[in-house]
Amino acid sequence: MADEAIKNGVLDILADLTGSDDVKKNLDLNLFETGLLDSMGTVQLLLELQSQFGVDAPVSEFDRKEWDTPNKIIAKVEQAQ
């Protein structure tokens, strides 16, 4: 999958989960500090990433610091491809 397709797919997932297009405008937005993503949203995010991109990121190994911005999430998905 092309990087642009991954980026757009991740941003669409984040926009749906957060209910905000801010995630598409500011790729360095801290999703947790802004309250756009919480623990339940995190579980939904990981399930969507696994379903759409085959990313296997167990909740038990999830580190918020590594997944706290759209850019970091996109990078994680690209690494898993």
Swiss-Prot record:
Predominant location: cytoplasm
GO cellular component: cytoplasm
A biological-process GO annotation: lipoteichoic acid biosynthetic process
Keywords: Cell wall biogenesis/degradation, Cytoplasm, Phosphopantetheine, Phosphoprotein
Domain of life: Bacteria
Subcellular location: Cytoplasm
Modified residues (O-(pantetheine 4'-phosphoryl)serine): S39
PROSITE patterns per the UniProt record, alphabetical: CARRIER
Modifications made to the protein after synthesis: 4'-phosphopantetheine is transferred from CoA to a specific serine of apo-DCP.
Stretches assigned to the Carrier domain: 1-81
Recorded metabolic or biological pathway in which this protein acts: Cell wall biogenesis; lipoteichoic acid biosynthesis
Gene Ontology MF: a single term: D-alanyl carrier activity
The family this protein is said to belong to: Belongs to the DltC family.
Main function: Carrier protein involved in the D-alanylation of lipoteichoic acid (LTA). The loading of thioester-linked D-alanine onto DltC is catalyzed by D-alanine--D-alanyl carrier protein ligase DltA. The DltC-carried D-alanyl group is further transferred to cell membrane phosphatidylglycerol (PG) by forming an ester bond, probably catalyzed by DltD. D-alanylation of LTA plays an important role in modulating the properties of the cell wall in Gram-positive bacteria, influencing the net charge of the cell wall.
Matching NCBIfam families: dltC, PRK05087.1
Protein name listed in UniProt: D-alanyl carrier protein
Organism for this UniProt entry: Lacticaseibacillus rhamnosus
Record lineage: Bacteria, Bacillati, Bacillota, Bacilli, Lactobacillales
